Amino acid sequence: MKRRFMALCLAGSMLLMTALTGCQRAAEQANEGQENAGQKNVEQTERTEMETLVVPEPVSMEDNYRTYYEVFVYSFYDGNGDGIGDLKGLTKKLDYINDGDPVTMDDLGCNGIWLMPVMPSPTYHKYDTTDYYSIDPEYGTMEDFEAFLSACRERGIKVIMDLALNHTSSEHPWFQEACSYLKELGDGEPDPGECPYVLYYNFSKEKKSGFSPVKGSDIWYYEAQFWDGMPDLNLYNEELRAEIEKIADFWLAKGVGGFRLDAAKEYVTGADGSNIEILSWFNDVVKEKYPDAYLVAEVFSDMAVYEKYYDSGIDSLFDFDFANKDGIIAKVVKGNTPASFYSQRLQEIEGIFSAHNKDYIDAPFYTNHDMGRSAGYYAGEGSEAQTKLAGAMNLMMSGSAFIYYGEELGMKGSGKDENKRAPMYFSSDPSAEGMCRGPSDMDDFEMKFGSYEEQKDDPSSVYQYYKKAVYYRNLYPEIRKGTVNDLPE
């Protein structure tokens, strides 16, 4: 049920008042030199907030309006001391994300986790899998994954997995068998009865744009739009579709709450209509057996393109127009666009999206693993306040909002992809327990704000600001589920 979005104004005002109060308190302490008295005031304020805390109502596992935390397991928390994040480490740090106790304010309060790929892969990012039914040994075992899911259920956290259906690894057995068959076949015509996997991919005797040569053959080529290590799948093949149905059922039966669908705009290169049909097929397959599963697709483009993908019936599409350094949020925060445009656009998208799917759930996000970290969008005096405001603007949008790990700490990282996936900044000591070494090609750079250890007890920190924004989002369902209206001046 849609409700008027009055809570947006209330919660937004509270957040801004908190920021202003924090700045004013710091200034007064500096001017008057009353450090002890200032500390006493801070402690008293924190006690008062805790004593008057209103506990948010729990969100049922069937409710797909949530606040998701995107986790790159490789860089989050190391549970076995090898320098690489893993599922045991993530499970150990779940209390950081959500401790399952709504009365406490020690956790961030997110009630959803988007798990970046965890299936076996030859790359550090793992978007090119070699096995859709297993866990990458770097991350642990299937038992570790099941223990993680169980711990999430206890805390009311819904877990969605990254599912890359556009391509596999070139080391996947399907692709390896198909290539071996074609090399032996030579210039003949492939028979799927002899090797069904030749129709799982897009092979051709003609070298087209985005096609790479089959190694060991001077006749055959295969489509690989991203790079030759990621051969594109032929998602119109019925045998492959049957396999994908089994893959989805395998994970959903284990208790996974849904999927983030990678690169949906690339399923069929340059063919939005075909991609929408494929999304519609997958959505129908999943929802027939798991009606409460949550599906959100990545259509990396502008709104004029991705709005059409709601015709598929999918729950959510990432709202790219508001994200990144040139998105609506950053433009408003920098003062390059009037603040009224933010409200205006929120109202406009309700009509735009609902015209395609009346049951849509918006998926606002501010940055992710493919974008520069948001703390780098702002510089100079006031940049901390800008970082906070931008985070709050994302979290005040309706739908299921997404936070990329470390954004709540104001982590930095730009340029090459590895820099955007740096180790979670739990501690400024890289040798501290659980700290990850990060991707091997990551540059050396310093963070802009303090680590979690340094921010957690500072009431005016970026972390505390994010935590309060998530709290208000949890407290007022109108923020997640409401519509937007301008208030009269």
Label for each model-derived stretch:
Residues T18-G22:
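C-terminal motif of bacterial Sec signal peptides marking the signal peptidase cleavage site
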Residues R25-A26, A30-N31, N36, N41:
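Asparagine/serine/threonine-enriched low-complexity, disordered tracts
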Residues F365-N368, G380-E489:
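Loop/helix patches that line or flank the sugar-binding groove of alpha-linked glycan CAZymes
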Residues L10-L16:
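Hydrophobic helical h-region of N-terminal Sec-dependent signal peptides
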Residues C23-A26, E46-A242, A253, R260, ...:
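Acidic/aromatic-lined carbohydrate-recognition and catalytic surfaces
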